[in-house]
Amino acid sequence: MAEVVLQNVTKRFSDHVALDDVSMTVPDGSFVVLLGPTGAGKTTTLRMISGLDQPDGGEIFIGGMPMRGLTPAQRNVAMVFQQYSLYPHLTVRENLEFPLKSPLLSTPRAEIDRKVKAIAEVLQIAHKLENKATALSGGEMQRVSIGRALVRSPQIYLMDEPLSSLDAKLRADLRIELKSIQAGSGATLLYVTHDQIEAMTMATHVGVLQQGRLVQFGSPREVYENPVSIYAAARLGLPRINILPADIFAGAPPRARNIGLRPEHIRQGSGEESLVTRVEHLGDQTRLHLSFRNHQIVTVTDAHTALRSGDIVKIEPNKPLYFDAEGMRLA
Ligand SMILES: Nc1ncnc2c1ncn2[C@@H]1O[C@H](COP(=O)(O)OP(=O)(O)OP(=O)(O)O)[C@@H](O)[C@H]1O
């Protein structure tokens, strides 16, 4: 496995700048998740690293080697797309074996069998090994595509929302499996997702992309607790961070335009009165929807709370984040 370095990478599509001077180091053995809304440049970043597309400016290094001019095969990267890409006329087993049968690798038969079996078990498709790829459900095909990447030992795995087409239970299972495969093998993984839970649970680092610019890079915890802007703060956390006018509570510093309060950073029982508008019991926690001076706030409370819609609850900020008129964090 290898470190991947992007140095001032820029990519334009006619006059649209999809990646704008992006510099980023994906450390060897890390699990980096790229975050950003649609169009932020996540897929473009993966395509540049894979060699499917060329940057207009800047350099990409994998394992210290410059990648300019090298084909995807020469880069030895494994990519999993959101949409499965299988050989339809081959069986699941043949699809999984395919990458190992490359003449360059000359993997021994016993080794191929062992790897295919192990991966098929992890991905819960062992019972479908002899089926034709076309005889699978969408979720099964996607698992085979993931398997085709995992049987290899590339320099880096590039995955673009690989779990988004799977049902919730399988997604939760595979999240744990992928993370343990990565942690166990020391693989380097660059991963795109819109799923907050995937990002928080799997990433060693997250990179926040905003209109083609990398605006923050750090551990999920760092980005969660110390976001550089409202934009970065809104990328992690569910329910989302509450953004309110800064003067809605006393104590805002000069130049503060907005206060950001994570749902769990609102103390209840003292402070200002707010109205409970909805109580959502989710089992392990309860969400309170509050109306406070014409603003809606979401906070969390005790799972067995007796609060009901129409009640009054006192609230005050705990660990507030302040942002200026441009949405940038104030120290
Ligand atoms: N082949 C292309 N031709 C023209 N424009 C493109 C092309 N590929 C991407 N773009 C543009 O570049 C920008 C970044 O696209 P990209 O696919 O990287 O976004 P993304 O963050 O992956 O979004 P999504 O979450 O929707 O996949 C977008 O504005 C997109 O329209």
Task: Tell me what each language-model feature is.
Residues D56-E59, Q211, P320:
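Conserved coupling/switch loops of ABC nucleotide-binding domains, chiefly the family-specific signature
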Residues P72-A78, Q82-V228:
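ABC ATPase nucleotide-binding domains
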Residues G251-A331:
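Non-catalytic connector elements of ABC transporters
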Residues G58-P66:
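Conserved ABC transporter NBD signature motif
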Residues S50:
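Helix-to-loop junction immediately C-terminal to a conserved catalytic motif
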Residues L35-P37:
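The feature captures the beta-strand-to-loop junction immediately N-terminal to the Walker
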